[in-house]
């Protein structure tokens, strides 16, 4: 999971050193966040083709979804300088809220 302490430490390091080690930072980005977004985009495109979602741009939809379900938790973990993450119940509540907002925007009417 992206908010595990070891992953947070690696993300902080790579972000901090991206200017000095751009190839390493890019490799991480392409291997983790970018791959996840590409997978989500493919899923959303498929759901759009089946008439289940209204998706004009699957890549934008993937970014919206990822930030809605993870953005608040990840920002808190990254900026607070602590490896303490939210409780599982809080993470689930935020993810559920993100899914509701996503479906409100993308559900086929």
Which residues does each predicted region cover?
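Membrane-interface starts of transmembrane alpha-helices
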Residues: 54, 58-62
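Amphipathic alpha-helical packing segments from all-alpha helical-bundle domains
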Residues: 1-9, 13-15, 23-50, 93
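C-terminal peripheral helix-coil segments that are non-catalytic and often amphipathic
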Residues: 34, 38, 42-50, 63-109
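Generic structural "secondary-structure junction" signal
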Residues: 10-12, 26, 55, 76, ...
């Amino acid at each position: 999971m992206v908010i595990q302490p070891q992953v947070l430490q690696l993300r902080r390091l790579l972000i901090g050193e991206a200017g000095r080690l751009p190839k390493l930072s890019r490799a991480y980005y392409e291997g983790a966040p970018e791959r996840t977004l590409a997978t989500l985009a493919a899923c959303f495109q498929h759901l759009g083709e089946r008439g289940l979602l209204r998706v004009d741009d699957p890549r934008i939809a993937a970014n919206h979804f990822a930030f809605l379900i993870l953005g608040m938790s990840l920002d808190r973990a990254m900026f607070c300088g602590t490896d303490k993450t939210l409780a599982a119940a809080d993470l689930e509540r935020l993810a559920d809220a993100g899914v509701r907002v996503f479906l409100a925007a993308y559900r086929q009417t």
